[in-house]
Amino acid sequence: PEVGQVDLMTRRIVDTNVSEDYAEPVEQLSDTARIMRIDCGEEGYLPKEALWDSLDNFADNALVFLNSQARLPDIIHSHYADAGYVGTRLSHQLNIALLYTGHSLGRTKRKRLLASGVKRDVIEQRYNISRRIDAEEEALGVAERIITSTNQEIIEQYGMYDYYTPEKMRVVPPGTDLEKFHPVDGSERDSTIYQDICRFLREPDKPVVLALSRPDQRKNITTLVEAYGESEELKQMANLVIIAGNRDDIRDMDSGAQEVLAEVFITIDTYDLYGKVAYPKHHHADDVPIIYRLAAASGGVFVNPALTEPFGLTLIEAAATGLPILATEDGGPTDIINNCHNGYLIDPLDKKAMADNLIKMLADTDNWKSLAHNGIKGVREHYSWSAHAEKYLKIVKPVVDKSEPLTRMDLRRRPMLYHDRALFTDLDQNLLGNPDSLKEFVRVIQENRRCTTFGIATGRRLDSALKVMRKYHIPLPDV
């Protein structure tokens, strides 16, 4: 009742390769909510990395739409870097408070991709990462409130940015649909998706190690396949099921997805995992809850091996069905496991640790049951949509009422030119040589990043140094 109207603005797409719904300018969701599709550059589908040159056009058309309405919105809430770019312009032009949610952040993605061995120029070419980071910086400077999913985002991810202002940041975990994602009910094996999965497997009754994500390099699917393929014990205990989007002809997919799927299939062939790994070509959105429940019914585990995971909605969905989780230690999974106590965290690049944890979880039936029960209970307590909405409105209300002042930062970036102190240290002897003091050192660096140039000296190769820094949570240096 406190919300009069919600307009979700997104790009209008006219393309025979996607549903005709995406071409509809207006889609009414309820009496008080609708999707408004705004014209933006060319009509066809474009991946988000290719949208940057069209965003000013989107902002102009969005401004025309907003000014044509009976009343202007009280707030603008932008999600991801591209919408942050648009939101900063609309906020300035209309003098409306901006809220911003970055979700996955460019600086964090670049750091993790470098650590996994991807070259800097490849990252730039593939992801337009510099433009993305610039847009994120600008949105952080303009936004009155930054909404995050986890505390880890505030400290470890946003803390890497020039416009890091923790006093403006608020944690509101996303919710999940508990009517759709529910515990096992016995109907799972009657589904078509169960038959699709079984046709890959020699022993389909084994527990399932499940991975479900987009075919994206950042999701680190190949490392999971390698971890499985290198562990004879794990291969004896469980099947591996990979749900990585939908595909007809891989050659028609974008280059990034082609590369990931090619790596996965080559790895399956290298370790001769035929009959042990399922990788169905198609699934529907309605199949996803069933897939989780199939894995839970088998006594399996859901794995999210992503290099970094801003929140981890799939982990919440899996937990709601009673499926224990094993997840990357980088990002939102930390908060989820702290709240739900339903799994373990891993270094996503440590294949042995990944396999060992899976074996431990699959082998101990009593512990598995405890993790499954904890997950169902924890999701209901912490991750329902009603709890999410209530917390969000408590943050928005003082912004709308103007009971808290609108805060816009001076949009002058803080490169090293504006730092008034510097700290340089050796990686192996100084930092790794004193693990007891390392946590305190990291805390001090994080608290002073806005005024301090931080440098690391090392004889290691770049990929080796970044991997060690990630393992010990050492902030990315300026030099």
Stretches found by the model and what they are:
Residues 13-15, 430, 459-464:
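Short active-site-proximal "capping" loops at secondary-structure junctions
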Residues 222-226, 261, 438-442, 462-463:
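Short amphipathic alpha-helical segment that frequently serves as the phosphate-/nucleotide-binding helix
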Residues 329, 427, 459:
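Fold-independent oxyanion-binding glycine-rich loops
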Residues 419-434:
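Asp-based phosphoryl-transfer active-site loop
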